[in-house]
């Protein structure tokens, strides 16, 4: 396990040494990884840092409002409304790796716009160790690693938590005094809901994935999963009232894990599963059926794409 106080001191020193007297921007998503990286960087270089939150339209329910409130102490925080730009970029894209790269390039473009505005030379990211392992092993790229364009107009990229596992990042978050809503938050992928949508990403699919994931997180809180969410797989036939419908198939996934490198699907009570499907199909008329994913990692990955 990580020695938090020692790590925090070393990370801040590393950030100060890397950035020097220059300015930097940081990708702030609201997840524990980027939140820890942002807090470390903010405490290290203060007003030289501009935290950038990009609302891609692929975020969790209520995420943007929560970010504004939680990080209001960072006066330099910028919230970028980029939903339309990201959906335009993703139109017609169905390959999982291409989606990740498109999103990665979109993030960098947004950051570069702010960086040019504030004269930033460095990009800070919340990349953690499992991200790098999966990218280097070609299991899947991560938007903050493999999704970077070949040419980036930053002098350098700083990744203060790059050698930590998820549970270690949480320890650091607690030591930094971050709120529980951040330190204990379930992992959320950098590309957002895009990796929970099989095939083309559209505003409709994103809305279904967002609302269904909110239901899953609420209903499974007592199970204390490492990660729990809903994914939109495709369409199938169903019945609503007396009418035959062709609606979305939503997969529910809930896993136990220490660090995300391996994971086991949780055994959930039948009544819990029925309550989840009832809420998801009842609250969204475009959902025809709900299934539960029992696959461990390996052979599956935790996310769908």
From Swiss-Prot:
* Entry superkingdom: Archaea
This enzyme's EC code(s): 6.3.5.2
**Gene Ontology CC: one annotated term:** cytosol
**Segments forming domain GMPS ATP-PPase:** 2-185
Q: Does the keyword ATP-binding apply?
A: yes
| Keyword entries, A-Z | ATP-binding, GMP biosynthesis, Ligase, Nucleotide-binding, Purine biosynthesis
CDD domains registered for this protein in UniProt: GMP_synthase_C
InterPro entries (UniProt xref): GMP_synth_C (IPR001674), GMP_synthase_B (IPR026598), GMPS_ATP_PPase_dom (IPR025777), NAD/GMP_synthase (IPR022310), Rossmann-like_a/b/a_fold (IPR014729)
A Gene Ontology molecular function term of the record:
GMP synthase activity
Q: Main EC class of this protein?
A: ligase
HAMAP family recorded: GMP_synthase_B
Record's protein name: GMP synthase [glutamine-hydrolyzing] subunit B
Could you tell me which species this protein originates from?
Halorubrum lacusprofundi (strain ATCC 49239 / DSM 5036 / JCM 8891 / ACAM 34)
């Amino acid at each position: 396990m990580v020695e938090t106080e020692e790590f925090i001191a070393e990370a801040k020193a590393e950030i100060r040494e890397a950035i020097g007297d220059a300015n930097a921007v940081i990708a702030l998503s609201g997840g524990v990884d980027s939140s820890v990286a942002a807090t470390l960087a903010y405490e290290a270089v203060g007003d030289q840092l501009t935290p950038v939150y990009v609302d891609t339209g692929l975020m969790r329910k209520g995420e943007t409002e929560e970010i504004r409130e939680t990080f209001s102490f960072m006066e330099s925080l910028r919230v970028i409304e980029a939903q339309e730009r990201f959906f335009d970029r993703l139109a017609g894209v169905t390959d999982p790796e291409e989606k990740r790269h498109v999103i990665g390039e979109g993030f960098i473009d947004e950051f570069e716009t702010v960086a040019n505005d504030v004269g930033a030379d460095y990009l800070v990211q919340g990349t953690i160790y499992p991200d790098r392992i999966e990218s280097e092993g070609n299991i899947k790229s991560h938007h903050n690693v493999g999704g970077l364009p070949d040419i980036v107009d930053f002098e350098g990229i700083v990744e203060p938590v790059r050698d930590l596992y998820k549970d270690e990042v949480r320890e650091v978050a607690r030591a930094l005094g971050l709120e529980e809503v951040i330190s204990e938050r379930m992992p959320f992928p950098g590309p957002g809901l895009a990796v929970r949508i099989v095939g083309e990403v559209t505003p409709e699919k994103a809305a279904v994935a967002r609302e269904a994931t909110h239901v899953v997180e609420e209903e499974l809180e007592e199970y204390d999963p490492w990660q729990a969410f809903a994914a939109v797989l495709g369409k199938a036939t169903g019945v609503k009232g007396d009418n035959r419908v062709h609606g979305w198939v939503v997969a529910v996934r809930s896993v136990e894990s220490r660090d995300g490198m391996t994971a086991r699907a949780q055994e959930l009570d039948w009544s819990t599963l029925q309550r989840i499907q009832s809420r998801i199909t009842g609250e969204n008329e475009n959902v025809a059926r709900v299934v539960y994913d029992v696959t461990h990692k390996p052979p599956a990955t935790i996310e769908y794409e």
